[in-house]
Amino acid sequence: MASEAAQPDAGLWSAGHAFADPPPPYDSLSGRNEGRLSLLIWTPPRTHLHRTLLGPCRPCQFRQPPPERARRRSGAAHALPPSEPLGAPGAAPNDVRSAGVLALAGYWQPPSFFRKPGLWPHPTSQGTSCRASRCTPRLCRTTPQPMPLSWPFVRPNSRPGLWRPTTSDERLTRARGGLLGSIRASCTGPNAARGSYDHAPYRREGCCGVVGRHAVFGVVAIVVVIILVFLWR
């Protein structure tokens, strides 16, 4: 029966192949669906596997890459000249450029602070040995030369033996005014130079100041009282 039903569709089979019943849900090659359509519905399991069935638990440890792999990665990342931008076609390998697909910016050539100009001189000018003629100072066996430090508060002096920290003119004027005011107050009284040294935190009174006059008046008053007591008796 199956062979007779498949006679109209015999042209679909090449010579030398024996006819066989097709797998369900189709019973023939004529396009008629005489079988029952079977659906496979997959549902996730409600019970989780036991921890012992998954194998022993091993802590995940961070393993550093071997030095050879790290050396190859750094060499591939810094092999291009520093003047080439990150998104340029030269930042991708040859096979990627030939396929016409550009790599993302920053993947083949990550930015590095060693590419900033002015940190160290070019290694090839010093006659050092590099792995490539156009390489960065990171790949060269050179000792980094520290730049001279220029502090903002150091004023260049003609005499190198003498150095003192700089002081603003306002502070110098305030200190001189306070010193002159204190000297003038010790000789002529506090009212003579009150306008110039009132703001000085270290103001001091002289021998003729307010405290001195109060002390003199107190001593004179005590002496007068004692004299009056003796005369009354």
From Swiss-Prot:
Region Disordered: start-end pairs: 57-92
Pfam family, one: Herpes_UL56
Similarity field: Belongs to the herpesviridae UL56 family.
Protein name: Protein UL56
The species this protein was found in: Human herpesvirus 1 (strain HFEM) (HHV-1)
Lineage: Viruses, Duplodnaviria, Heunggongvirae, Peploviricota, Herviviricetes
